Amino acid sequence: MIKPRTPPGIMELLPREQIAFQRMLDVIRRNYERFGFLPVETPVFELSDVLLTKSGGETERQVYFVQSTGALANAAAAADEGAESGGLPELALRFDLTVPLARYVAEHEHELSFPFRRYQMQRVYRGERAQRGRFREFYQCDIDVIGKDALSIRYDAEVLAVIHAVFAELGIGDFKVQLNNRKLLRGFFESLGVAEGELQLAVLREVDKIDKRGAEYVRDTLAGEGFGIAAAQVDKILAFVAVRSNGHADALAQLQALETSVGASVTLGEGIAELREVLELVKALGVPETAYCLNFSIARGLDYYTGTVYETTLTDHPQIGSICSGGRYENLASHYTKSKLPGVGISIGLTRLFWQLREAGLIAGIAESSVHAMVALMDESRLDDALDIARRLRIGGINTEVQMEPKKVGKQFQYAARAGIRFVVLAGDDELARGVVAVKDLVREQQFDVARDELASTLQVELEQAKAMLVSGIAAN
């Protein structure tokens, strides 16, 4: 007999956990749609030559390729005959949602209205080394605004407002959207004489590690043989990336101080101007100043970001790391079209976020069920009544299960409790003779009678009053 087991790197949930996960998806989707983003889905696999526009490197080593049994047989036969391999398999599973978006926009460019506002919530696949908290299959929940030729910086502020709306409704505790601009970093590096493009990108990648690896690690790396940056310059870089703002006015003051002390090179001046505009618009969008700050160390490791960058963290749980990130890029689809398609977007890695929240004990919705009520059956002769009660409840918007076979009441209560069902409806001879049903509330441990015709509306009121937030922060110590 084969031992049942899931592959490593997969998060498989029990039903009540899946309900909590699904509700988080629903919150994210609802907020994306409130801001006018349109749904898009792309195939789970793409043509390999389209997906892997840059061959080699870490990305290709993590890609899952797809090959039919016929193609495998043909490849094996060719190998037996000494023929050379025909190259990569034709198809590959997507490893993020950004490359499929680039292909999608380029392919449908003349059918889309720009700026194109899309959201996409699908699984992606990476051949990660199996370890705790790392997944080979995981959900990403992305939004992007794509422009044609140009895209206003105002959309960068709107994206930050979307981040705030999502996490405010999720209710997973206080959070902070940390904001920076790559032009700010590049302009500052230029003022230190670090102007060569590849060197700048390499320094940016190291700076982005400062929160994870610490300032001393970054200092040793930048001053080491690989970079050879003078110690005095490294000190200036570390002092610069240590800047954090506290409140809206302080953020603007930090930008003014930077402009005064360093001097506004073209690149630095653009970065400062863009951040100023984003900050002013974020305020106009109603995002509270406690929800965002400047953090000059945020660079985002991906090289295609060119302007605004975001990282979101939970204030009381920094060990969880970034829960949402993204930024501005200048040309999304340069490998697929000559059109210039700048954009800005963010991604929530929901699988990892959910896993981290569960590990930290922050998921409050796990004890819930999508079934609100169960109609008990104590006597075979009352099956028709039980089915009618369930039908009326469903019409009234109450998700309802019926016990199809009579059992002892205690066993039916036990079943409902284990399934996370809150209300058990009892319709025995005595209740029906009085025109009522009895309702057992397993959460409050109370029982009450309700007129049969008022049952659905009564339970609706009870559910609305007791509607708990999906997730809650741990109470302050």
UniProtKB/Swiss-Prot annotation:
Entry keyword Ligase: yes
PROSITE patterns documented for this protein: AA_TRNA_LIGASE_II
Ligase among keywords: yes
Secretion signal span: none
Enzyme class: ligase
The protein's Enzyme Commission number: 6.1.1.21
UniProt entry keywords in alphabetical sequence: Aminoacyl-tRNA synthetase, ATP-binding, Cytoplasm, Ligase, Nucleotide-binding, Protein biosynthesis
Cellular component, GO, one term: cytoplasm
Compartment(s): Cytoplasm
Entry's Gene Ontology BP terms: histidyl-tRNA aminoacylation
Catalytic activity: tRNA(His) + L-histidine + ATP = L-histidyl-tRNA(His) + AMP + diphosphate + H(+)
One Pfam family matching this protein: tRNA-synt_His
Residue stretches in coiled coil: none
An annotated Gene Ontology molecular function: histidine-tRNA ligase activity
Family affiliation: Belongs to the class-II aminoacyl-tRNA synthetase family.
Subunit structure: Homodimer.
Name this polypeptide is given: Histidine--tRNA ligase
Native source species: Xanthomonas campestris pv. campestris (strain ATCC 33913 / DSM 3586 / NCPPB 528 / LMG 568 / P 25)
